[in-house]
């Protein structure tokens, strides 16, 4: 769990160095509100991004939505993309779904279907642009104004302040408002406090691993192996925990661990060793049991889709 805050122009010029010294793990920064107009940019956003980057604070962003229909939502999407250009957040980008000032209610609150479609329009557009996307909502909005099942693929930032723990599954929990005791050194609204949050997902690791939000995707790990056809040593993305020949008694099970971005195939070069079906052991990791049923020596091979078949080691059954 990481502890964080969310801030906007109302927090003034945040002392990010002091906030970091107090143990701040992340920040969610308001970048603006409504349609794509410069007059609706948050005047503190650019500074907050610079200061978070300078102090090593992972950050994400949010836009307060005034959209009444998917057409409005497309403008809000462009607003986000304009302000995010050239920046590399390590947390998702959220659409803030609420009606704090009554704007939507005064104009006829859109239906649940329309509000859900507004979120989908923005989040899908963010994902198409390479960002992790999500939405912010409180309990009332989740229960009466949005359809969470249709938004399950997006990060959920849940506003449920002043309770011991959230009453529904969420990725980020807004745990306190100033009115419920939320405070953070360097970030408190003058004469008040600060919104505080907790993240149950290690988003910095996920963003880097998946190459989202402008971060380069790390190259897949490789391991040298002998190509079966040419006999040349090549690099394969199927990394084994076994690189030397194996010798086991007849009937003994040997477990091979494979790490690969795609599910590889494992085969024996001849009879004598049973290669059991692969079983998943986490993301991009598989286990394969090898059992010798006839004495002798057998080559064990792997193949990754798009790569050559490789001889990995010899399995001797005694």
Sequence positions of predicted segments:
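Aromatic-lined carbohydrate-recognition surfaces of secreted/lumenal glycan-active proteins
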Residues: 129-144
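Glycine-rich, charge-decorated loop segments at or immediately adjacent to ligand/cofactor-binding or catalytic sites
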Residues: 72-75, 141-150
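Extracytoplasmic soluble-region selector
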Residues: 223-318
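A mature extracytoplasmic/lumenal domain signature
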Residues: 9-11, 33, 63-65, 99-101, ...
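Hydrophobic anchor at the start of a short beta-strand
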Residues: 59, 132-134, 156
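Substrate-binding cleft of extracellular glycoside hydrolase catalytic domains
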Residues: 1-121, 127-129
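Functionally critical loop-and-helix segments that line ligand-binding/catalytic clefts
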Residues: 1-11, 17, 21, 149-230
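Structural recognition of alpha->loop->beta junctions
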Residues: 81-95, 99-101, 146-169
């Amino acid at each position: 769990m990481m502890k964080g805050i969310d801030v906007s122009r109302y927090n003034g010029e945040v002392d990010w160095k002091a906030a970091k010294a107090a143990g701040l793990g992340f920040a969610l920064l308001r970048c603006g509100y409504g349609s794509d107009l410069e007059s609706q940019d948050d005047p503190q956003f650019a500074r907050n991004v610079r200061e978070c980057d300078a102090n090593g604070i992972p950050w994400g962003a949010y836009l307060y939505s005034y959209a009444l229909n998917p057409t409005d939502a497309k403008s809000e999407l462009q607003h986000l993309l304009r302000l995010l250009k050239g920046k590399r957040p390590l947390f998702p980008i959220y659409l803030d779904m609420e009606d704090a000032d009554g704007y939507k209610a005064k104009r006829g609150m859109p239906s649940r279907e329309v509000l859900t479609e507004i979120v989908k329009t923005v989040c899908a557009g963010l994902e198409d642009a390479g960002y992790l996307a999500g939405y912010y909502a409180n309990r009332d909005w989740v229960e009466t104004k949005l359809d969470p099942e249709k938004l399950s693929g997006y990060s959920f930032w849940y506003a449920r302040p002043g309770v011991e723990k959230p009453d529904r599954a969420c990725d980020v929990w807004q745990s306190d408002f100033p009115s419920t005791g939320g405070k953070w050194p360097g970030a408190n609204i003058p004469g008040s406090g600060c919104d505080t949050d907790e993240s149950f997902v290690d988003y910095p690791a996920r963003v880097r691993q998946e190459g989202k939000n402008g971060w380069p995707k790390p190259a897949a790990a490789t391991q040298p192996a002998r190509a079966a056809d040419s006999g040349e040593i090549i690099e394969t993305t199927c990394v084994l925990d076994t690189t030397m020949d194996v010798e086991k008694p007849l009937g003994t099970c040997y477990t091979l661990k494979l790490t690969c971005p795609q599910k590889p195939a494992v085969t024996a070069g001849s009879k004598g060793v049973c290669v059991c079906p692969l079983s998943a052991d986490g993301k991009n990791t598989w286990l394969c049991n090898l059992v010798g049923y006839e004495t002798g020596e057998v080559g064990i091979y792997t193949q990754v889709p798009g790569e050559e078949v490789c001889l990995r080691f010899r399995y001797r059954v005694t």
